[in-house]
């Protein structure tokens, strides 16, 4: 029962995300491809990674990662930020253009959050939040906190 319910909710969020990505992906100069949109999501979740960290996470070559990153920089979705500890290294920073794009994608998540708060008691919402934090921080250690 739990597995089925979890999978249904997770799949619905994925479907909504994919729908929005493909709505935003256009065949014109400067638009994002689906792969670029997913790459930006990974960079966001890795929180200012280096190109090496990005490549390692996706299990792709450094040159392939560099190619993807350079395209995203050209399109204005990504910026390079020099490392404070090693001037030869830089971190990937998401641009304002990316956050404008993300606002369109996250509207569904906010709608679901509003529905949760309207449907359940404050106590239930707080318990659900606590459970989600435990799941994220303790039960999914391979992705850090």
Explain the meaning of each model-derived region.
Residues 68-71, 131:
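Residues within the DNA-recognition helix of helix-turn-helix
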Residues 71-127:
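Charged, amphipathic alpha-helical coiled-coil/dimerization segments
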Residues 22-63:
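N-terminal helix-turn-helix DNA-binding core of bacterial DNA-binding proteins
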Residues 5, 39, 112-113:
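Hydrophobic alpha-helical segments typical of transmembrane helices
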Residues 1-4, 122-145:
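C-terminal regulatory/oligomerization modules of transcriptional regulators
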